[in-house]
Structure formats: C-alpha cells, structure tokens
C-alpha cells in the first residue's frame, strides 16, 4: 500500500504528485488494470504462448536482418 505524508511547508499538489509517482513505481495502476477482468487459466496460458511465439518471431527477424 502506498502512503505519503505531507511534509512541513509542502503543498497538497506536491504531495499528490509524490503519491502518483510512488504509485507508478510500485506498479499499482498496472496491477489494477490486470485484475479488472477475470481471465481463466486457459486464456492466460494461450496469451503466454502467443507472447512467446511473438518473441521468437521477433528474434528470428532481428537475426536474419543483421546476418546479411
């Protein structure tokens, strides 16, 4: 959980900016977006497999591009 204490002489706007920065660093928004909708284990497995295939394809493309 992210918490920010307002420092002495600090405006609320500055504290809010620090809070937003901390949320970004800790990946709070990414986690919220990830958990927004439930994905069944089979869908997660398919997505992971598709991502792996994409990475392999990219790597092969890069290798063939630079080997010429």
UniProtKB/Swiss-Prot annotation:
Pfam families: Ribosomal_S21 (PF01165). Disulfide bonds: none annotated. Coiled coil: none annotated. GO terms for cellular component: ribonucleoprotein complex; ribosome. One of its GO terms (molecular function) is structural constituent of ribosome. One of its GO terms (biological process) is translation. The keyword Cell wall biogenesis/degradation does not apply. Keywords: Ribonucleoprotein, Ribosomal protein. InterPro entries: Ribosomal_bS21, Ribosomal_bS21_CS, Ribosomal_bS21_sf. Belongs to the bacterial ribosomal protein bS21 family. This is Small ribosomal subunit protein bS21. It comes from Endomicrobium trichonymphae. The gene is rpsU.
């Amino acid at each position: 959980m992210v918490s920010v204490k307002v420092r002495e002489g600090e405006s609320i706007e500055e504290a809010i900016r620090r809070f937003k920065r901390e949320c970004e660093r800790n990946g709070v928004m990414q986690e919220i977006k990830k958990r927004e909708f439930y994905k069944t284990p089979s869908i997660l497995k398919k997505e992971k497999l598709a991502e792996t295939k994409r990475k392999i394809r990219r790597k092969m493309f890069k290798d063939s591009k630079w080997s010429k």
